[in-house]
Structure formats: structure tokens, C-alpha cells
């Protein structure tokens, strides 16, 4: 009887691991850096604040799902003028978190995030 229970627990653990792997595949860490016309700065900043953490002027970062990432890209494209503005997006898998080192003043310390 104990063997059957152990096998059952192992099957459940395997399913949980598969679900976790699927969820990780659906998520990523992004850093977005933008240089847009002054007339669009507040609009793009307000939009990105809804989805990511503000780091400093023109820089946002955070963990998002693939679906959220696509919504963010679509929102950015609706705001910017592609002939005049520039947005750079760095994507990282969740199992590879970039190391961040701050030189000088930290504009938005992580412990300020509620």
C-alpha cells in the first residue's frame, strides 16, 4: 500500500513540476528603455507604470507573462512615433536574472515598492 501512495505522490509532483515549467516558459523579465519626443514622455511613462517598475528616467523593468509583454509592446506602438522615437526592450528568461549594479544615486530603491 505504501508503494502505491508513493507512486501517486510522485505523479502529482511530476505534474506540479510540468505546470511550473509551463508557467516559467510563459514569463520573462524585461527592461524597457525609451527615448521619445517630449510630447509623448508622460503618456509612455504613465502607460509603463501600469505594467512595470520604474527604475529611473526612461527606464522600467519587471516580470511579465508573454501575454502581458505583447500588450505592453502593442501599447508602446500605439503611443510612439516610430519615425521619431526609440524604445529598446531587453528580454531575459526568468531563470537568468540580470545582475544590477547601481553607481551613484538610486532613483527608485526596491524597498520603496509596496
Swiss-Prot record:
Protein name in UniProt: CRISPR-associated endoribonuclease Cas2
Pfam families (UniProt xref): CRISPR_Cas2
Its biological purpose: CRISPR (clustered regularly interspaced short palindromic repeat), is an adaptive immune system that provides protection against mobile genetic elements (viruses, transposable elements and conjugative plasmids). CRISPR clusters contain sequences complementary to antecedent mobile elements and target invading nucleic acids. CRISPR clusters are transcribed and processed into CRISPR RNA (crRNA). Functions as a ssRNA-specific endoribonuclease. Involved in the integration of spacer DNA into the CRISPR cassette.
GO MF terms held by the record: metal ion binding; RNA endonuclease activity
EC number annotated for this UniProt entry: 3.1.-.-
NCBIfam families according to UniProt: cas2
Cofactor: Mg(2+)
Binding residues for Mg(2+): 35
Matches recorded under InterPro entries: CRISPR_associated_Cas2, Virulence_VapD/CRISPR_Cas2
Gene: cas2
Lineage summary: Archaea, Methanobacteriati, Methanobacteriota, Methanomada group, Methanococci
Keywords: Antiviral defense, Endonuclease, Hydrolase, Magnesium, Metal-binding, Nuclease
Subunit-structure text: Homodimer, forms a heterotetramer with a Cas1 homodimer.
GO BP annotations listed: defense response to virus; maintenance of CRISPR repeat elements
